[in-house]
Amino acid sequence: RLSEDPNVSILLLEAGGTDRKFKISMPLGFLSTILDPKLGWGYMGEPEPHLNHRPLWLPRGKVLGGSSSINGMFYMRGHPNDYDTWAQMGARGWSYDDVLPYFRKMEDSWRGENHYHGTGGPLRVEPIQTRHLLHEPLKQAVLAAGYPDTDDISGAQAEGPALGELTIDRNGRRASAAAAYIRPALGRRNLEVRLESQARRVLFDGQRARGVEYQRGGQVRQVRARREVILGGGVYNSPQLLMLSGIGPAEHLTERGLSVKVDSPGVGRNISEHPCCMMEFAAARPVTFVRELRFDRAARHFLQWLALGTGKFATQLNSCNIILRTDRKLAQPDIQLMSNPVTFSAKVWMPPFTKTPEHKFACGVVVLNQRSRGWLELRSADPLDTPAVTLNIMDDEWDRATMIRGIREARRIYRTSPQAELTGTELLPGAEVQSDDELEAWVREVCEIGQHA
């Protein structure tokens, strides 16, 4: 967007390489991209104090487009109360009414133009094609369990069982930041993109940022900015880069042998991430997406996507995006259920060489408005060293209690008709895990993150 102004010149430094890869473009390829070490930073967190001291996997994209090139493409706004709370806390200009016009301007929504959605923007938003993903049984079960209906989580009713939405273009390709914003601008003479160029620190003249030191091909280089330096490294790399540049908690910087430019204790603090526990249920009948992963069918789906940009590999695997208030006294929802007609461990199978996989449902229970907060520190003054990240997941008792309520509600919904007729044995955490103490112990053992920090 900056390059729309012909009076400015822009240099974009990207630590990773090109995003022009089949598995990035193909929506169902996200199951592979997020695991590919060539496309990510390979971050592992520090031992989590409230998760049995387990380190958490922290996937972040190291490729043009960043994490938007490897993520699940799920499109969903925060609840209006989130933005209004920011404004009430002093972030003027960030209320829901303030940001809604920018959401609308950004979108090219399949829903068309209305009060909540826009058309003609750079980011195409499409519905998940759910006819083969068992959306309707889950939706009806949620309604039968007493929750309100909605057809648009990002619209007037931000609560209930909704059709999931994805950032996918009209040709069935991932609409990442690279595809939607950067690539269309590459023909502009005032924009240069340098790949495999990792920023090391910000350069200063006095107290003013004047450039960036970066590393490319084993060589350390410097570039000077005529106007400004913008950090876009995300939740982990931006604070790391600030601290490497001398901006952060003075005591910590001194311990790492860095000169203090600005003592800013908040840098690297107050990291917020959604806790997520993955439940699994056996399917009572062979109805899950595992059917479509049989080799001959998977090959046909891939070729259909490649030739036409359509079919079952041109979408994602979410059956229903369920947003709930487990306590009606709450001002806004506290739980998201990411319901899928297959587990993420499912793979392409070829009879008779591989055994027919079990049919399973997966349900990610996600705590919204979590209260636990984490932090990030430098391991060393080496810019190529990874940051030390402690998310402090489940530190707050409210988060633990909310997760347990969410697990109980997921159980109730999957045992409510018509979904109940499709649901077999509970596999994770297992029907024998019933008390709050037992559920909390399971949460500490298996809880991961929503990758939304």
Q: Which residues make up each language-model segment?
A:
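N-terminal glycine-rich phosphate/pyrophosphate-binding loop and immediately adjacent elements
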Residues: 1-105, 263-266, 274-283
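Glycine-rich loop(s) and the adjacent beta-strand/alpha-helix scaffold that form part
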Residues: 4-11, 16-21, 26, 202, ...
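Acidic-histidine catalytic/liganding microenvironments
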Residues: 5, 188-189, 416-417
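Conserved redox-cofactor binding core of oxidoreductases
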Residues: 20, 50, 87-209, 213-215, ...
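Cytochrome P450 core scaffold surrounding the K-helix E-X-X-R motif
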Residues: 22-23, 80-88, 204, 374-376, ...
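Short acidic, glycine-rich loop/turn motifs
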Residues: 45-52, 63, 213-219, 324-330, ...
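FAD-dependent oxidoreductase catalytic-site/capping-region signature
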Residues: 100, 106-157, 162-164, 287, ...
